[in-house]
Amino acid sequence: GDWSSDVCSSDLGNAYPEVKQYLEMERKVLFTGTACQIAGLKNYLRKEYDNLYTVDVLCHGVPSPKIWRMYLEEQKKQYGASVEKAEFRNKVYGWNNYSVTIDFSGMQQYCVQFSEDQFMRMFISNLDLRPSCYACQFKALPRSSDMTIGDSWGIERVMPDLGDDKGISVILVHSQKGGRILQEVQEKLITREANLDEVLPPTADSRKSVAMHPNRKKYLRGLQNGESFDVLYGYVRKSFLQKAAGFIRYM
């Protein structure tokens, strides 16, 4: 299937060896991923390459691949069809209230605002993230990548004229190489300089480790004991909407 989002865990497969192979062939390589994936690549390569360009995406955390598979199975059961494509940032309801859409074989589609989707509720409430995400060593700035990109949530507070609900990206440059990349594409973009702490507050989940959900241990125990997706989802419980509002404002 096609999973169009930073909400799912990506499968790196043989990406690191392939990157090294292309670099040794003196080909230019652009590697994008989470900050921890880029740190892993740098650790694997053990040396700097002038022809390697790295861009990390702002990251809230990465959910369990197992719960993602369980979620897909639930969707397949409900619709009686296989999943062809999933999007977690669809703008059919606007950027701030983005929707989750799933295309099934047979032309069926599931489409709800993110705050109504069970998988997204578990993700945003920090219930189903990887253990390392609760003590992330890679969210500090500056990062080992050349650039960081992501959604500029809350931009309307800083630059009201940009609050059109169509989506604004934030770009952070960490190296001379990153600066050159931005300069080369600048004429194709509408850009504006901004204060870092205003567009990406230090309290944002993309700059600090997220807090563990109070029911996390119960959830893990249930996952290990083979509890159903619906039972596991029940551990989200209270204060979700409050958490979701904070997620939109400060991710």
Where are these regions (language model features)?
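Short cysteine clusters
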Residues: 7, 36, 133-136
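Short, flexible loop segments at boundaries between secondary-structure elements
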Residues: 50-74, 202
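A short, well-structured juxtamembrane/interface segment
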Residues: 11-22
